[in-house]
């Protein structure tokens, strides 16, 4: 409900009351203009492809774990990867780290699923963490996942914040096509885009693990080509009315 309805109106208020809209997703902007029948922003800066500022402490050496960062939803796809964890742990030593709000209905359901399937040895659960702790928890993960299964989700138009966080930690992305930067991921070798099926998840995780150093190289190259703008640069854009 919040994602597909309430967010639309929050998005409207944000875009119509700000001097500058900083858009990470051209698909989201196109969907916004279709929905309201007109452009909403006075000035819009398109950050597509989105910039990445790699964390200096991100560890580039071989890693073994998988990360899911953010709000667990019904369509997050965690139910697809959970049954695969014993095999992945046996093959490459992988565990799944779930980091995000711990009291939502879906998060609690996932925790119950972990318990009922006997997966406690293969899953680590965390609440939202301060940035310093987040880096420490994520640094041994070789990929970040976003396996959205609902093509009608508003998230299908967006660039999930978790994607930027993954790339900042030099982690390639394993995602379904239900996001706003499929082209960026594929064209820049930043991860793997798949259909939401268990067999594809299994083979793709193995590929990302095997080729993680090549993906790290691609991420560093991308970050160099797409740096963040400074606050001064944004303020100048507002002043100039660009």
Predicted regions: what they are:
Residues 34, 39-63, 77, 242:
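Acidic anion/phosphate-binding donor-loop and adjacent secondary structure
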Residues 4-43, 52:
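A short, active-site helix/loop in glycosyltransferases that binds the activated sugar's phosphate group
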Residues 137-156, 171:
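Acidic donor-binding loop of glycosyltransferase active sites
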Residues 135, 157-169, 182-183:
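Short alpha-helical segment that forms part of, or immediately flanks, the ligand-binding pocket
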Residues 100, 108-136, 143:
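Nucleotide-activated donor-binding/catalytic signature segment of Leloir-type glycosyltransferases, i.e.
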Residues 50, 57-85, 97:
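Conserved donor-binding/catalytic core segment of Leloir-type glycosyltransferases
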Residues 196-198, 209-241:
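A charged, aromatic-enriched C-terminal amphipathic alpha-helix characteristic of glycosyltransferases
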């Amino acid at each position: 409900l919040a994602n597909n309805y309430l967010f639309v109106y929050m998005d409207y208020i944000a875009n119509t009351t700000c001097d500058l809209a900083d858009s990470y997703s051209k698909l989201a902007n196109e969907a916004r203009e279709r929905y309201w029948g007109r452009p909403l922003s006075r000035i819009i800066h398109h950050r597509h492809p989105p910039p990445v500022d790699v964390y200096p402490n991100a560890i580039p050496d071989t890693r073994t774990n998988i990360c899911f960062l953010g709000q667990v939803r019904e369509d997050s796809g965690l139910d697809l990867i959970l049954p695969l964890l014993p095999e992945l742990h046996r093959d490459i030593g992988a565990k799944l780290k779930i980091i995000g709000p711990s009291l939502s209905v879906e998060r609690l359901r996932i925790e119950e699923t972990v318990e009922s399937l006997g997966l406690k040895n293969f899953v680590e659960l965390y609440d939202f963490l301060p940035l310093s702790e987040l880096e420490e928890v994520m640094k041994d993960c070789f990929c970040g996942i976003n396996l959205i299964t609902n093509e009608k989700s508003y998230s299908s138009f967006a660039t999930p914040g978790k994607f930027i966080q993954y790339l900042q930690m030099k982690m390639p992305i394993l995602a379904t096509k239900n996001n706003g930067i499929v082209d960026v991921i594929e064209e820049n070798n930043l991860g793997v885009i798949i259909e939401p099926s268990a067999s594809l998840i299994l083979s793709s995780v193995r590929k990302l693990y095997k080729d993680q150093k090549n993906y790290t190289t691609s991420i560093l190259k991308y970050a160099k080509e797409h740096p963040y703008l400074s606050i001064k640069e944004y303020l100048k854009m507002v002043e100039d009315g660009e």
